[in-house]
Amino acid sequence: MSESSSDSDSSCGWTVINHEGSDIEIVNSATASDNCGLTLECSLVEQEELPVLYVGHGGEESSANNTSSVGETMLSSMRETKSAAEVEEAPSPEDNVYFGTTSDDSDIVTLEPPKLEEMGNQEVTIQEAPSSDDLNMGSSSSSQYAFCQPEPVFSSQPSDEESSSDDTSHEPSPAPRRRRNRKKTVSISESEEPPLAEPEDEPSKEPSKRHFSRGLNKCVILALVIAVSMGFGHFYGTIQIQKQLVRKTHEDELDGVKGYLSQRKQEQESFLDFKSLKENLERCWTVTESEKITFETQKKNLAAENQYLRISLEKEEQALSSLQEELRQLREQIRLLEDKGTSTQLVRENQVLKQYLEVEKQKTDSFLREREMLLEEARMLKRDLEREQLTAMALRAELEQFIPGQAQSRAESPSVQTEEKEVGLLQQRLAELEQKLIFEQQRSDLWERLYVEAKDQHGKQETDGRKRGSRGSHRAKSKSKETFLGTVKETFDAMKNSTKEFVRHHKEKIKQAKEAVKENLKKFSDSVKSTFRHFKDTTKNIFDEKGSKRFRAPKEAATEKTRTAYSYSSYSQQEAPNQNQNCRRPSAQRDGGREKPSHSEEIRKNANSYTYKAKSDCRGTHSTRRVCSGMFECAGQEAISPVNKASPVRMNDFKQLIHWYLLNELETFHHWKELDQFISPFFPNGVFRHDQQLFADFVDDVKGYLKSIKEYRVEDGNLEKLDGCIYRHFGHVFALPFGPRSVYIKPCYYNSF
């Protein structure tokens, strides 16, 4: 393209931007004189031209070929203005940049923009100067141009010969920037030479140029229309290419995101695997640590056990060595005796000693049997004594109960003084009975203490006799035969004498205590019976004289129940030897009769049987057949003191107590169903029925049923304590007013009452 075309481009204010490659060319506009010398044809072209034009590769080549002839005519009109501008200014090669000129250092071509005062009146025109086929607008076939308005900036004075290599200028200039290839930069100096040589022929060709300029304008317009259409087509193709590029970039980005996600997933899986591996390692570490600790503890235990075994082995070795030494000595003694020879005297002495030993064994066996019998008899005496104590307490409680009723009737009764005397006598009698009971208790405690002391002394004597006998035998081996026999005889004589004395003393004490207890029990039972009958008759007379309906029913019930208790005690006198043969046989053989112990036992059972809390409990529990009219009647049914209070006996509690006792005493019991079938009829609705049978009789029946089972007929009497355990659990534990019992009495007998 020529200089004129470059001037027209710069004057029209177009900026050309090439989108291909990385090289940029900046084209500055020409001087103000070039802008003023535009022709009329250029102004016509400006009116019809678009503000922005995108020109493709094919459009560029066609427009350049069509407008090459038009550029030649335009040069003539441009020379005069250009020459005047060249005269006014002396341009330097650094001030102006020729269109299409490049340098080896840069691909930027800069054209100086117009001045600010001329920018307002300036219009946009495009002219294409003639150029050779090899120039092709100084761009590659794939170049794309964008034309836009230049930015108004201050610039220095431009020159036509300014080099395109002026990259270092710091002045801003609104010049069209075009990207082009380096290889296709062509110098303009050759194309500028012909127009510089033609100014001499312009005056002669001026009329023809005008006519030609009109046709040229039409051609230019046609070329511009073609170029615009081609530019729009190229722009549409560019948009499609851009869309494809955007789609492709999106696909690439999507592929990259997918790859990144897959990579992150793999990393996460590897991290999870690492985490699980770490947990497994920690678990294995803890297991190994625990195993290590257990191994260390086992090692310590084994070391301690080894040490203990070593010590015990040393002790056993020492004992074995001592036994071996003793065995060696015995063998030596046997050898010495064999050397001396056995004589008939030694054989006789041995026979005599054997006879003594047999006699003493028989005596000790008889003593042991007699001791067991005495112990059993002592237990029976203790039980009888305790029964009498309970009977006295029951009588005292009944007396205290009837005292308020007597006090109320004293005001109405004429025999107040006689009753007071009788009450005083009864109180004195009770005091005497209490004193007798205390005396008997002290005597029984003393007897038991003496018996235990004698037993301990006898045991010590037996152990001493054995030690002396063993020592005497050892001495006899070392000493002469006479010394050995003498020591053995002395030992046996001492044991015999001590045993005889102990047995004699013990028998005397037992006889004395037994006789005293019998007498006291007889006197006590007689006095209690007489006192109770007298008291009963007195109270009966009092209530008969009073004639009160309120006191008549309890009085009759009390007399009836007391008579029933005594009649039942007479019946139990016949049944007691059969039911209690195991525990009372020794004393029965000695005494011959069991009337008083059986009577006292029945009183104890009735006194320790289950009682009731209050009148409401009695009425609520016994609502069938025989209903309790009051607390006195309920107490009379069980033959106990009316001051005792308790809850109804429930079947679950009774079964639990029986199960607990049998498991503790017998350890194994396999007849639970039979026992439940035996117990259940006495507990309708889960509560014991007193109108069917007394609770004491029921306990005796259960005890007899358990004894009747063949598997549990044990000689040690495990079932003898069953009734005491039941009474202790369900009955009232009386606080005995006679002080603490002896320390030698078993807790079961003490706590059961």
From Swiss-Prot:
Modified residue Phosphoserine is at which positions? S187
Keyword Phosphoprotein: yes or no?
Answer: yes
Q: What is this protein called?
A: Cell cycle progression protein 1
Q: How does it assemble?
A: Interacts with MCF2L. May interact with MCF2, ARHGEF1, BCR, VAV1 and FGD1, but not with TIAM1. Interacts with GTP-bound CDC42 and SRC.
Bias (Basic and acidic residues) occurs at: 457-467, 553-563, 591-605
Q: Where is this chain's protein located in or outside the cell?
A: Cytoplasmic granule membrane
Query: Where is the sequence biased in composition, kind Polar residues?
Result: 62-78, 122-138, 573-584
- Alphabetically list the UniProt keywords: Cell cycle, Coiled coil, Membrane, Phosphoprotein, Signal-anchor, Transmembrane, Transmembrane helix
Q: Which residues lie on this side of the membrane: Lumenal?
A: 240-753
Where is this protein chiefly located?
membrane
- Region span, Disordered: 57-211, 457-484, 553-606
- Which family does the similarity line name? Belongs to the CCPG1 family.
Keyword Hydrolase annotated:
no
Q: Which gene encodes it?
A: Ccpg1
PANTHER family registered for this protein in UniProt = CELL CYCLE PROGRESSION PROTEIN 1
Entry GO terms, CC: membrane
What does the record list as coiled-coil region(s)? 298-449, 503-529
Transmembrane domains' residue ranges = 219-239
Q: Which InterPro entries match?
A: CCPG1/PBIP1
UniProt topological domain (Cytoplasmic) ranges: 1-218
Basic residues bias (residue ranges): 176-185, 468-478
Q: How does the protein associate with the membrane?
A: Single-pass type II membrane protein
Acidic residues composition-biased segments: 190-201
Region Interaction with MCF2L and SRC: list its residue ranges.
1-307
Q: Name one GO biological process term.
A: positive regulation of cell cycle
